[in-house]
């Protein structure tokens, strides 16, 4: 994970403000935990962190602001034209050292069942953001390679550049990483690397209710939880 953070901050394709989009196969895969943990980790390193959220949902940006103290903006291609989205993104992120964009639902899930319009994929394409795919790897091995292959090849130019494995032990991670990168190389996607993992740890469990209104005591607990997640990552 340390190498992933270093690469993100040295992305030559985005000289002024490096950033990436965190997406997943589906909801409840660990996107929010990963996004919040990484924001916390970068802040602890003294970086100026900026956040975005795909879609019109206001709850996650509110969570980014209230719990992490990170300015956050919605990136919505359903209500906004592409040019307006690009302009808003550049204005929002211009003073940041790193920008983390949190996806919505699954990577290709848009505003309707049969369209990618407004999806995380759509936003990544529009802004030219590299994508890190968060995958719940608990109870899986070789099948993970098949899942990645299917998602990467479902549409052209997916922009997926990294895989973040969720719910993986420190002991198993090196073996899963080696297997996945070998398989990805074999099927012609050697540019995609496994960039890190999140262990099975309570600090990465953010219940849905935590993303709404919380009491002052819950706020303190959440801030401490996210701080610990950042230290682990």
Where are these regions (language model features)?
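ATP-dependent carboxylate-amine ligase catalytic core
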Residues: 5, 11-33, 39-127, 135-162, ...
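Short hydrophobic alpha-helical runs that function as membrane-insertion/retention elements
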Residues: 131-134, 195-196
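Internal gly/pro-rich beta-alpha loop/helix module
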Residues: 142-233
């Amino acid at each position: 994970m340390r190498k992933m953070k270093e690469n993100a901050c040295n992305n030559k394709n985005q000289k002024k403000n490096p950033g990436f989009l965190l997406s997943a196969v589906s909801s409840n895969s660990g996107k929010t935990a990963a996004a919040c943990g990484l924001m916390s980790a970068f802040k602890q390193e003294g970086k100026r962190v900026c956040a975005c959220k795909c879609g019109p949902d206001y709850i996650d940006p509110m969570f980014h602001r209230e719990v992490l103290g990170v300015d956050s903006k919605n990136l919505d291609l359903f209500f906004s034209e592409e040019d307006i989205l690009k302009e808003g993104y550049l204005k929002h992120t211009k003073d940041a050292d790193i920008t983390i964009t949190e996806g919505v639902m699954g990577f290709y899930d848009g505003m309707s069942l049969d369209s990618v319009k407004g999806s995380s994929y759509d936003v990544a394409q529009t802004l030219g953001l590299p994508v890190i795919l968060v995958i719940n790897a608990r109870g899986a091995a070789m099948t993970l390679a098949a899942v990645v292959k299917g998602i990467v090849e479902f549409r052209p130019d997916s922009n997926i550049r990294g895989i973040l494995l969720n719910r993986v032990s420190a002991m198993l991670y090196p073996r899963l990483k080696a297997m996945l990168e070998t398989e990805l190389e074999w099927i012609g996607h050697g540019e995609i690397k496994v960039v890190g993992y999140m262990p099975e740890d309570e600090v990465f469990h953010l219940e849905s209710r935590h993303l709404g209104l919380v009491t002052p005591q819950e706020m303190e607990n959440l801030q401490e939880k996210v701080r610990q997640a950042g230290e682990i990552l």
